[in-house]
């Protein structure tokens, strides 16, 4: 019996050793391939005019400029939003010629370079300002935050108000959000995710997995689907944003001083059951009635009402901030670009 158990453990040990050796070999291969795989996607994007790498200080940032309008909207991405440049190019088609979009990214997003520095709110803002100057994009700017970039835009417009003529919060993170847990199992899980993700980025595993498994999303991006796929395959998003989530938010919220810069905070809350059905049809091409009812009830919950109240308090603390709701997807502009474009034009009318 004991010999049988020893034999089983010996077999398991050998299998584990083989897997470990295989992992080590693949890591070496992927690390060697990382640069060439990223360059392949850069070449695809360059052919379609989506490459404009400029110095952001210690790394190169891809700064895509769409249009030559007087009013320059600096669009900042959500967490790991690979397709922002394409989204802004598509959205620009709904706006007047005097409005231009400038899509900026963060370290490791799309084809932007990587950084060894700590990804803090201050670092993101300063590196983005440097990149815009090097790209020849002059102030004043209209900042547009989506989701995770909310704290960065909040800090920017409070730290350098002389550079900013307007702000658009597109369903972005605000002081209404809860902090990440800083103890117990949730903290351990976060730290593990950061460690594994950082290792995968550095060793080429992220790039290799994207090259093997990432797929085109033709329904959302049409003729630009291959470009969004190229951005995704090239991306090695920095996990410093996850690690520094709480401190980055605190830095932003502590900087707030009410000012007169025109702002609009656009949410995507469902107001009716029909809103939910429209969203599900947009997302899946069909409507699950049970799911629609469930999502609608969630949108009417006490927690959601309290969250919306906190967003209103956040807007009030910023000064001169109007609240607008467009029932839609998280991105808003992908499902309802015309309605979103109208709100941009209304903000610019306030700036003029």
Per-segment meaning from a language model:
Residues 219-319:
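Conserved serine/cysteine hydrolase catalytic core
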Residues 106-142:
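Active-site loop/oxyanion-hole signature of alpha/beta-hydrolase fold enzymes
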Residues 65-111:
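Conserved HGGG/HGGXW glycine-rich cap/lid loop of the alpha/beta-hydrolase fold
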């Amino acid at each position: 019996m004991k010999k049988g158990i020893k034999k089983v453990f010996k077999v398991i040990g050998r299998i584990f050793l083989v897997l470990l050796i295989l992992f080590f070999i693949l890591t070496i291969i992927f690390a060697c391939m990382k640069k060439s795989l990223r360059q392949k996607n850069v070449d695809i994007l360059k052919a379609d005019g989506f490459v404009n790498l400029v110095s952001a200080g210690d790394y190169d940032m891809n700064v895509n400029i769409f249009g030559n309008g007087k009013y320059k909207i600096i669009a900042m991405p959500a967490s790991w939003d690979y397709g922002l440049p394409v989204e802004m190019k598509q959205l620009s088609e709904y706006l007047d010629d005097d409005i231009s979009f400038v899509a900026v990214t963060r370290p490791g997003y799309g084809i932007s370079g990587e950084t060894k520095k700590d990804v803090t709110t201050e670092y993101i803002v300063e590196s983005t300002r440097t990149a815009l100057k090097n790209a020849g994009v002059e102030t004043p700017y209209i900042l547009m935050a989506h989701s995770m970039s909310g704290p960065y835009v909040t800090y920017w417009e409070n730290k350098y108000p002389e550079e900013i003529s307007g702000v658009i919060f597109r369903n972005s993170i605000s002081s209404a959000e809860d902090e990440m847990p800083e103890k117990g199992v949730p903290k351990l899980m976060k730290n593990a995710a950061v460690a594994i993700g950082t290792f995968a980025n550095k060793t080429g595993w992220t790039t290799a997995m994207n090259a093997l498994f990432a797929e085109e999303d033709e329904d959302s991006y049409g003729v630009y689907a291959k470009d969004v796929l190229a951005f995704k395959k090239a991306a090695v998003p920095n996990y410093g944003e996850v690690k520094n989530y709480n401190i980055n938010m605190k830095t932003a919220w502590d900087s707030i001083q009410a000012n007169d810069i025109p702002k609009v905070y656009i949410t995507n809350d469902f107001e009716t059951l029909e809103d939910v059905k429209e969203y599900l049809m947009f997302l899946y091409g069909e409507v699950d009635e049970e799911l629609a009812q469930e999502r609608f009830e969630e949108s009417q919950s006490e927690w959601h009402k309290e969250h919306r109240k906190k967003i209103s308090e956040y807007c009030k603390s910023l000064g001169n901030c109007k609240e607008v709701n467009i029932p839609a997807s998280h991105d808003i502009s992908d499902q309802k670009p015309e309605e979103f474009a109208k709100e941009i034009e209304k903000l610019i009318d306030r700036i003029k």
